[in-house]
Amino acid sequence: MSDTSTPGSQTLSRGIRLLEIIAASDRPPTIAELAGALEVHRSVAYRLLLTLESHGLAFRDPSGRVALGAGLAALAAGVSRDLQQAALPELNAVANELGMTCLLAVQLDHEEAVTLISASPRQTVAVVSYRPGHRHPITRGGPGKAILLSLPAEAWPDDVDEQLRAEIDLSRRRGYALSHDEVVPSLWSVAVPLTLPGQPPASIAVIHVSLPHEEESIAERLKAAGERISRAYGA
């Protein structure tokens, strides 16, 4: 964060960053841990938290640890309602047909991708839970790499090395991205780019502990679903 920020914009930036830290934490953090992550005094973190609590965006449990509030769900529903209506039926269909968790991810910023919508199969031996809001580097995992396929090289993050460039070139030629053991240990992912009118670069992907079908046939199923989502969303 720049020291030249105006007080109002700096406070807003810190509040947003606080929400991001809470969302990325493996367990609800304490106020002291939030202050440390923000590199601010505990009193500053406390005031930010009070504001978030007043809007239902965060809350403290009986032990004093901080979690995200239900108000965020209401905000998210408003942002993605049209996309939910267009994508969820297709994600459910793919998940149930292939027996794999299906998700839609978008580019969050220059460095990260975030899952917006996910669907789990109704009947399968092993169900992989992958919640909306899950963030990971755009250079790791099938969903992020599929997004890179749709971007020119100059729009890639600076840490894309020659090995990853070669992998992306291969993925672009075959039309899909493949990953194993990159974002979540032991999980496989197949993903394809997805174009959504008026939205950031996106991808549609499946994840599972194995590949129960040929990766090429999985990719073709994802492409068909992606085309229907794009048409429904742009209608």
Stretches found by the model and what they are:
Residues M1-R81, R231:
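N-terminal helix-turn-helix
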Residues S9-L12, G69, Q84, L88, ...:
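Short, structured helix-loop boundary elements
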Residues A23, L148-P152, K223-G234:
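Short amphipathic alpha-helical signal-transduction/dimerization elements
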Residues A58-F59, L104-A105, L194:
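A structural signal for short hydrophobic beta-strand segments in well-ordered beta-sheet cores
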Residues S63, D109-H110, P197-Q199:
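Short strand-connecting beta-turns/loops that link adjacent beta-strands
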Residues A67-L68, A73-W156:
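Amphipathic alpha-helical effector-binding/dimerization core
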Residues V160-A232:
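Extended hydrophobic
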